[in-house]
Swiss-Prot record:
UniProt keywords, alphabetically: Ribonucleoprotein, Ribosomal protein
Phylogenetic placement of the source organism: Bacteria, Pseudomonadati, Pseudomonadota, Alphaproteobacteria, Rhodobacterales
Keyword Ribonucleoprotein in record: yes
Name of the protein in its database record: Small ribosomal subunit protein bS21
Record bears the keyword Electron transport: no
A GO molecular function held by the record: structural constituent of ribosome
Any one of the GO CC terms: ribosome
Native species: Dinoroseobacter shibae (strain DSM 16493 / NCIMB 14021 / DFL 12)
Domain of life: Bacteria
GO BP annotations, alphabetical order: translation
Record family assignment: Belongs to the bacterial ribosomal protein bS21 family.
Amino acid sequence: MQVSVRDNNVDQALRALKKKLQREGVFREMKLKQHYEKPSEKKAREKAEAIRRARKLARKKAQREGGL
């Protein structure tokens, strides 16, 4: 990952780097890999995440249809 520093503005470059890492999911992956996760726990977590995403999508869809 590469970020250019313009006008010696390191703070702005650091913010850009953090934003890129966040978008790529690096922080989330690091957090998940801090400890070993059993395959059964991983499967349960992924299933719960999928359910959460589906509910969120349904909520947004209902809100859009309700607004029309």
